[in-house]
Amino acid sequence: MNKELQTVFRYHETTKHSQKRYAKSLGYMDWATQPDPFRIYKGAKNIKLPLSLHNPTAPYSLLDEDLPSAPLVQKSISQLLQFSLGIAAWKNSAGSSWAVRCNASSGNLHPTEAYLILPSMMENNKSMISHYAPKNHALEVLAEFDTDFFDTLEKESFLIGLSSIAWREAWKYGERAFRYVQLDAGHAWQALVISAKMLGWNITRVDNITDEEIARLLGLNQQKRFFEEEKPDMLLIVSKEQSSPSLNISSLLDNLPQNYEGIANKLSPSMHAWEIIAEVEKATSLMQIPQPEAKRCKVTREPSRESKEVVLNRRSIHVMEKEKSNITREQFHTLLKSIDCSLDGKENAVHLALFVHRVEEYAQGLYLHVRNSKDLHSLKKEFHSTFLWQETAFENLYLLELADFTAASKIISCNQDIASDGAFSLGMICRYSKELLAFNAHRYKELYWECGMIGQQLYVEATSLGLSGTGIGCFLDDLMNTNVLGLKNNLYQSLYHFTVGVGYVDSRIQTRAAYPKM
């Protein structure tokens, strides 16, 4: 085993929560150093984007149909960003104000940043690299240059680079923050996928480039422009047709200017360094190894409201209304169908262990949604030998144990009522040790990205059904892995938890428009 894999395995074990101890953090909220959730580049030219609130969008139920493709113009770029990474609303309570975005984020801390690499357009005869500033709904132009690179892509295609500032999560969550950073990258990716579908566009992650190349493309290697480190996550191709995940960007890199415009704003007056995060960031920055491809999800849904209304109303709920959280079998099946097949075009590596509490026609108990049938034999071998593996009305959903898991699910989720008071909660069970050994340490991030994509999809799908969802990053890892599932090794690990039900709306919290002055 190489040193990078050793670092990843050590990081994961060290940052597990248990009944004896939680992963290390400061142990208090250091409000004086709270990071600014909005990155801006001082000195960069701003392109104000038009708001898309009045743009018609297809019903959410039709998003997986072959919708007509919008042209690549400023209006469509604006809509893509507003309905994925933009602000959905502002909230006010007890003198405090905070933004709610379309993409979910652990603790609403938003470590993810987005950069667009665009061909000549928007009355500009040069290609450009710009940063999306969601607070002002604007593009900050970092570089303008000539290149023939876009001639190698399908017409009207462009690139989006995602990056992360780990300090935003580490400020609150300490050494476990790297996990949440990767989940949020997955949240953002799937938010972009959903928004792109409204425009008849497709998004594919490039899987044959290095983190170093992405950093160079986005200007993240120009360290004098940054106070806090910002690390590359992924490069996405946005196109009208499904693209190949393999892309040669050498000509693009050759055409980049040596220095970009704009200086990144300082997010905190000071920082607390977490060496273990720096170590795992370095270990996972290896060249990625492409995964086997798979058919993407295409879900048939009941008629629903406009897509934009669904994504703009996505919220993370802190309290579930237990008495109202009974859901129908059809709602349950719709949620499962939405994430049953591949979201990222790769073979699924994540399965769902569900604590079913209040679902009509389903007995209370522990269930497993097997998202890749290739793993079924292995899962049966590794889980408790006493499990039933009884087939249900939903294909690839198995009843493992009949029991009331409301108390257990709450304990596992760091004693949070949201895990027990909804219709169901779940743990995302990932192929783990063999997966990392086969595909190297970069795969650790990719597993979290897949979990984040599932989480964002469940958020949006629940919203479309009039329900609420909430991601749960705080859970007792091995209480789930070992006690509940019976795992005796690390072939599988639970990486992210989630809950769905009917959320309590606090009338004391006021809502304001996302962009009131625009």
Task: Give short role names for the model-derived ranges.
Residues 1-457, 464-518:
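N-terminal accessory segments that position/regulate proteins before the catalytic core
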